[in-house]
Amino acid sequence: MRRTIQTALLSLDWLIEKGVRIQADARWQENSAKPCDTGSSVDDLKAEFAKVDFSAVDPVYPDKTSPRGAKYAFTKEAILERARSGVQDIREHKEKLILVVSHSGFLRLGVTGHWFFNGDYRVFELDECNEPDQPPKLKQLEATLSGGLGKSWPDPVVIGSDLPIPDAPPRGKRHSQDTTSFTSDNRLF
């Protein structure tokens, strides 16, 4: 979370000066449980970043490995669920524009299916979904197909690909009943 807060404070300072608040949210953290992808304690972050609102951060953060932290585990199911939850939460906000500063791996494999170069951005609109309990589809603006800086790979990946499935057979040995939770139009479900 520290890296994303630093990025937000540096790149969005002009909005912060106008009173836009920064809201920390544990759902948008990076995927793995490696030290480089596991956050610092909220108390440490509060002391370092007084301008950030941490009131909604899940108290279990930064735990990703205990039973309490299972919803943040480095598994396909956990990552896709927090992506769905995060996108659904955005849909429920009253603001017309929400900026998410997150991590490339999580955004690519859990949320958008698109690559992000360091410091790059993409712009998406939420298309309403008429199916109950389904999050909206993400529709990327054509101007950011290679990232807003033009440095990101334009070729999408399948959401959820390369994410670990506990107790799954090794790649190439999956049975036909093993399926994934995505559609070709990158709708999260």
Task: List PLM regions with ranges.
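Acidic, low-complexity terminal tails and accessory targeting/binding regions
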Residues: 32-51, 93, 108-189
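Short glycine/proline- and acidic residue-enriched helix-loop micro-motifs
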Residues: 53-74
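Active-site rim elements
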Residues: 29-33, 68-76, 111-112
